[in-house]
Design a protein with these regions (language model features):
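Surface-exposed, glycine-biased beta-strand/turn segments
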Residues: 5-73, 102-103, 129-170
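Short histidine-centered loop motifs in beta-beta connectors
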Residues: 56, 80-106, 134-136
């Protein structure tokens, strides 16, 4: 029997993981909401991971920014549902501003640390949110189910393509 995580979140948005298991990622700094727009906090999650790891688009969207801010390389993807996915401390981007990307598509290469942030945009109001709210990684967002045949469970599709289909709604 295969063990699979199935989303049970009330939200229709489940983002694709920005890296795969070969990255050996470890959280080094959790999301901490700032008290005000310019107040201290951590507006995303920071990971330690294997340098040169592939980074993947968390959702369908369009690359809205790719470049340096200060001495840090960033990539931002504007999703189809008014979210901005930020990849920071990347080594390089493999996509350019204006490129359409699909959930699960390789978009960048990591350094040995990586920042992942999510902003929700409502008109002129921008709000940083905890990426864990959308990543299908915690027990609060998923339950484990036992199935005899993984392919039958996914209708003949792989687990990865099923997760990607969920990310298309973000």
């Amino acid at each position: 029997m295969a063990m699979l995580a199935v989303s049970t979140s009330s939200s229709r948005c489940v983002l694709h993981q920005p890296f795969d298991s070969t990255a050996n990622a470890t959280v080094i700094d959790e999301f901490r909401a700032p008290a005000c727009e310019r107040c201290a906090g951590n507006r995303g999650i920071e990971f330690s991971l294997r340098q040169g790891s592939s980074l993947f688009s968390a959702s369908d969207g369009v690359v809205s920014f790719s470049g340096r801010v200060g001495q840090v390389e960033y990539l931002v993807i504007a999703t189809n549902f008014n979210r901005r996915i930020t990849y920071g401390r990347i080594e390089s981007s493999v996509v350019r501003v204006g490129d359409r990307v699909r959930a699960g598509q390789r978009v960048a290469v990591s350094t040995n640390s990586f920042y992942f942030g999510v902003r929700e945009v409502d008109g002129a109001q921008v709000r940083y949110v905890d990426p864990n709210r959308y990543l299908d990684t915690s027990a609060t967002f998923a339950k484990t189910v036992l199935v005899r045949d993984e392919n039958a469970f996914h209708g003949g599709r792989s687990e990865r393509s099923s997760r990607t289909a969920l990310a298309n709604a973000c």
